């Protein structure tokens, strides 16, 4: 089949590479210009460079709705459009243009976690599995019928970085399987409508989303630290007015009472910070902070940074 690919960052790069390695012909690539957004500067393998290396025409767009782009896609005569990590809405005159429409590759187990940063949100919410879905694009974002879906388990110490690597490796086989089904006509009867009653949709992550709220239970704070693992912007709080990024943490073994954010006691290789809206009861676990990092990039063992107990980690300076 003749394929037009729309994609960005490593997700789009993996998709394009899978298409180039297949029996299908990539006739045009559309990708976004480079961005200074923190979450778009990581996992930033360049789609345009890969396309140009293989002599595939490339168009750069923030939004794919101008007449020049629509004409270029029509002139390419695609049988299908394949999209992955396209960051803006696609109009129907584009996604319905090819005979087989548009196949979107999304890194969640749809209908859950449509939208942005699905792996981070899923980890934060304690999901047991994450994955990748190939679905038909329609007028509602990430809501079309599903053709192929694959998942991987979330381990108790997995970080968002671990899960990124595990799920990005699912892209190529999912792209190959989906296109082979469509090209051969074996996709008939295989498309499954999403259960919209189970759907959830999430916004882009920003610096505010990494700010620690010490009224959260320690279990959720520990997942936040893992969800904001390097190279993502780390979860952070403030100590004596200075921002402190929490690089490594766990849930404390003991239960500790007091005011959320109190730097309380050493436990094992870390320092326990009181956490949870019910911490006044003395029955809540604390967040065992193991490693911290200052804004200049210097990393410390928590036991070295917090030389004495007492004082507070706060949400604001």
Predicted regions and their residues:
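Structural motif corresponding to alpha-helix initiation and N-cap regions
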Residues: 13, 41-44, 66-70, 88, ...
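Internal alpha/beta domain cores that form substrate/cofactor-binding pockets in large enzymes
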Residues: 2-4, 25-30, 37, 54-76, ...
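Short beta->alpha connector loops
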Residues: 8-11, 62-65, 86-88, 229, ...
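Donor/substrate-binding cores of folate-linked one-carbon enzymes
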Residues: 22, 80-201
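A residue-level signal for conserved active-site and pocket-lining positions in enzyme catalytic cores
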Residues: 7, 29, 51, 81, ...
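An anion-binding loop in the catalytic cleft
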Residues: 213-317
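N-terminal Rossmann-like dinucleotide-binding module
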Residues: 1-42
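Acyl-group handling in specialized metabolite and lipid biosynthesis
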Residues: 203-216
């Amino acid at each position: 089949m003749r394929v037009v690919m729309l994609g960005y960052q490593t997700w789009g790069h993996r998709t394009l590479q899978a298409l180039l390695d297949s029996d299908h012909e990539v006739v045009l690539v559309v990708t976004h210009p480079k961005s200074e957004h923190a979450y778009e500067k990581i996992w930033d393998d360049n789609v345009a460079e890969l396309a140009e290396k293989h002599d595939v025409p490339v168009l750069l767009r923030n939004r794919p709705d101008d007449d020049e782009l629509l004409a270029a896609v029509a002139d390419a005569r695609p049988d299908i459009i394949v999209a992955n990590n396209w960051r803006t809405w696609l109009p129907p005159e584009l996604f319905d243009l090819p005979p087989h429409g548009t196949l979107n590759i999304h890194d969640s187990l749809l209908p859950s976690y449509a939208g942005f940063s699905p792996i981070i949100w899923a980890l934060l919410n304690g999901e047991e599995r994450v994955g990748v879905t190939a679905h038909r694009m329609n007028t509602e974002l990430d809501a079309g019928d599903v053709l192929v879906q694959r998942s991987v388990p979330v381990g108790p110490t997995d970080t968002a970085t671990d899960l990124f690597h595990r799920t990005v490796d699912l892209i190529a086989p999912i792209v190959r399987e989906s296109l082979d089904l469509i090209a051969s006509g074996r996709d008939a009867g295989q498309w499954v409508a999403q259960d919209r009653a189970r759907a959830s949709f999430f916004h882009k992550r920003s610096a505010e989303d990494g700010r620690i709220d010490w009224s959260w239970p320690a279990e959720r704070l520990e997942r936040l630290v893992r969800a904001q693992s390097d190279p993502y912007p780390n979860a952070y709080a403030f100590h004596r007015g200075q921002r402190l990024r929490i690089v490594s943490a766990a849930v404390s073994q003991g239960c500790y009472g007091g005011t959320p954010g109190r730097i309380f006691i050493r436990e094992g290789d870390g320092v326990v910070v009181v956490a949870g809206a019910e911490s006044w009861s003395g029955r809540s676990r604390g967040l065992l902070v193991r490693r911290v990092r200052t804004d200049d990039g210097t990393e410390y063992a928590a036991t070295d940074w917090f030389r004495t107990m007492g004082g507070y980690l706060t949400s604001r300076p």
